[in-house]
Design a protein with these regions (language model features):
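A glycine-centered loop/beta-turn motif at secondary-structure junctions
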Residues: 6-114
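Catalytic grooves of carbohydrate-active enzymes
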Residues: 84-85, 104-109, 113-126, 152-157, ...
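Active-site beta->alpha N-cap acidic-glycine motif
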Residues: 84-191
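Alpha-helical scaffold elements lining the catalytic groove of polysaccharide deacetylases
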Residues: 93, 191, 205-226, 271-297
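Metal-dependent polysaccharide deacetylase catalytic core of the NodB/CE4 family, i.e.
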Residues: 123-127, 151-247, 304, 309-311
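His/Asp/Glu-enriched short active-site or ligand-binding loop at hydrolase and phosphoryl-transfer sites
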Residues: 249-285
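Surface beta-strand/loop "capping" patches
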Residues: 345-391
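C-terminal beta-strand-rich structural cap/linker in extracellular carbohydrate-active enzymes
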Residues: 406-441
Length: 441
């Protein structure tokens, strides 16, 4: 991660100060800190330089750069080193899985296979912040969302292949005399259906009223304008904003958390409701954000981009204009998530189903000759695995299918309770307990 173009300086948020380790012979380095030629010239002494005599200049320079992630071996053991705090947050799950993939001749593990795009606080059903909306857009909030924001979002989703889940609130302000007008609810629900998208509920409000009170006040609105629509997902800025879990509507099956909860992993809020924290805001994508997304995709095949439109209605500065926000989300989705197109685009309720299956799945694995066998327990419909190979190719899958998503990495779809993966140019391995990763829950 290096600033190479004007304007990228604001993306650089990785720790620039780390201990400077130069690695020895037999080391495989995965990540290094970058230094200018001048800094290397002024800092590296002749004794260290002598160790790299005879190497090509560029190779010697790369060997001198401060190592961040590297691996060495002692007899048959492989020792991995992490120079920094990269194992202190959610990034650890991806780093550890990558280490496992580098340790063995092959590695296979389950993933969720879900890529969400959550649009929080869309659309507007009341003319809130009217003066500011007129000043910026010469239209009411309702018109801004229907005539400007909505067409832009559908265009972005169409170009990127993303599926939207729009988290709706009748209003942000409950202490004024303005009442929401739901005449456009049917319009949006129809448009969402056409886009293969869905609607959920938003817990946001300006006054921060308890969720139970907000749900109570919103209930009449939804019963009047969307009596037959089942809202199965809810958006909240964080777990604390949910308050008492009993306040959740009975039909809610999953809760999406805002970008402030990006350090958490998917799981259960309670025995009935899953939790899907944001993995990115979609607007701001720093180098560290990108690294965390890569780690999450490596470990789980999962991302949950959360674009909160509250700031469109209540902007704090020029950066909150929809023109600038839409350009950023379109550029980021089209650039930084392109590498993960092999994973499925999903809505929140679709990813909720996959998360439940992922967490319930038990599996074992064994290899004999060219065949890797996966016996599965508690499989409910489809399950997905990532298989990492070194110098081998998958040629056939019985009980499912496969797709090579990058060199040596395969996405395996399991459709039966036992899956056999045939690889090319393999030898025969027999693994005893503790000798190979693969048993898992």
């Amino acid at each position: 991660y290096e600033v190479t173009e004007p304007g990228e300086e604001e993306r650089q948020d990785m720790n620039p100060s780390v201990p400077w380790y130069t690695t020895g012979a037999g080391t495989k380095t995965y990540m290094v800190g970058t230094l200018s030629d001048e800094t290397i010239e002024q800092t590296v002494d002749d004794e260290i330089r002598a160790q790299y005599m005879g190497m090509e200049e560029e190779a010697a320079k790369n060997s001198l750069l401060p190592a961040i992630l590297w691996r060495n071996s002692v007899d048959t053991a492989k020792i991995f080193c992490v120079n920094g705090d990269y194992l202190a947050d959610i990034s650890a799950v991806g780093i550890l899985d990558a280490m496992m993939g580098e340790t063995y001749d092959y590695d296979i593990y389950p993933v969720i296979n879900a890529q969400n795009l959550v649009i929080a606080d869309l659309p507007a059903f009341v003319s809130e912040n009217e003066e500011e909306m007129q000043k910026r857009y010469s239209q009411s909030a309702q018109a801004v969302y229907q005539e400007i924001v909505w067409p832009s979002l559908t265009s972005i989703a169409s170009r990127t292949g993303a599926k939207m889940t729009c988290m709706m609130t009748p209003q942000f302000t409950y202490t004024d005399e303005e009442e929401p007008d739901g005449e456009n609810v049917t319009y949006y629900l129809k448009r969402l259906k056409e886009e293969h998208a869905e609607a959920g509920l938003s817990a946001d409000s300006r006054e921060g009223i308890p969720l139970s009170e907000k749900i109570k006040q919103d209930q009449t609105f939804w019963q009047t304008y969307a009596p037959s629509y089942r809202f199965l997902s809810l958006y909240a800025d964080g777990v604390k904003s949910i308050g008492e879990e009993s306040a959740l509507p009975a039909e809610i099956r999953t809760v999406a958390l805002g970008s402030g909860a990006s350090g958490q992993a998917v799981g259960y809020l309670n025995e009935n409701v899953t939790l899907q924290p944001s993995t990115s805001s979609g607007i701001r994508h720093t180098f560290l954000d990108d690294f965390k997304v890569k780690c999450m995709e490596t470990a789980l095949g999962y991302s949950n981009i959360t674009l909160d439109l509250y700031s469109v209605t209540y902007p704090e500065g020029d950066e909150d204009s929809w023109e600038k926000m839409s350009k950023k989300i379109a550029a980021n989705l089209g650039t930084y998530w392109k590498a993960y197109e092999a994973f499925d685009a999903t809505t929140l309720t679709e990813s909720d189903v996959r998360i439940r299956r992922f967490l319930a799945l038990d599996y074992k694995q064994q290899r004999a000759g060219n065949v890797i066998t996966l016996p599965l327990e508690h499989r409910e419909d489809a399950a997905w695995f990532l298989l990492r190979l070194h110098g081998e190719k998958v040629t056939e899958v019985a009980g499912g299918s496969f797709e090579e998503i990058e060199d040596g990495v395969y996405l395996i779809l399991a459709e039966e309770d036992e899956v056999s993966v045939k690889v090319q140019n393999g030898e025969t391995w027999q693994y005893q307990d503790g000798g190979k990763r693969g048993d898992g829950t």
